[in-house]
Design a protein with these regions (language model features):
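Helix-rich C-terminal "cap"/substrate-channel and partner-interaction subdomain
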Residues: 1-98
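Iron-sulfur cluster-binding cysteine motifs and their immediate structural context
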Residues: 105-136, 143-168
């Protein structure tokens, strides 16, 4: 029932978009159909990403362990489990793109948009040769990487054995 709210909001602005979205939700819940059918977004999500040079750096406060937590602490709450030796279910079409294209243009956004910290840029020794690392064991299967990657270079596949998060304790 809420599938059209964000596309309507994006197209018509805050007030008209939310009004039309509420009307559409009302029709979907009461009458069983969406007033506007399925409204598509204007463009793909990965096309909306701004270059790092166009954005200011956000300095987030340190987590306190009571109200805010580190990303990997939150991953542990999901009950994520992948067997050792399991093949990686996240693949890159071109392994050079994260470091050669996404890092200079976007400061490699995968390390920020992934809620589980699966992707990271590792800098060793002289700090001159960055390396893109995939920590697939942390993956909570949200598929954000498949949707948001600006180069559409990351492919998410279902892991073998259906392993992954177990959200029963969240």
């Amino acid at each position: 029932p809420v599938k059209n709210v964000k596309p309507l909001w994006s197209r018509f602005g805050l007030f008209l978009g939310i009004f039309l979205g509420a009307l559409d939700m009302w029709f979907a819940n009461i009458l069983g159909f969406n007033l506007f059918g399925t409204v598509k977004h204007k463009c793909a999500d990965h096309d909306t990403l701004k270059r790092a040079s166009d954005c200011k750096v956000i300095d987030y406060p340190k987590s306190d362990g009571k109200i805010s937590f580190e990303r990997l602490d939150n991953v542990s709450f999901s009950g994520t489990a992948h067997s050792d030796g399991q093949p990686c279910h996240l693949s890159l079409d071109d392994e050079s793109i994260p470091v050669n294209h996404n890092l200079p243009a976007y400061e490699e956004p995968a390390q920020r948009y992934c809620p589980a910290g699966v992707y990271e840029i590792v800098r060793e020794g002289d700090n001159l040769n960055p390396r893109f690392q995939i920590n697939y064991q942390n993956c909570v299967h949200c598929k954000t990487c498949d949707i948001k990657d600006p180069s559409q270079n990351i492919t998410w596949k279902t892991p073998q054995g259906g392993e992954g998060p177990n959200y029963s304790h969240m």
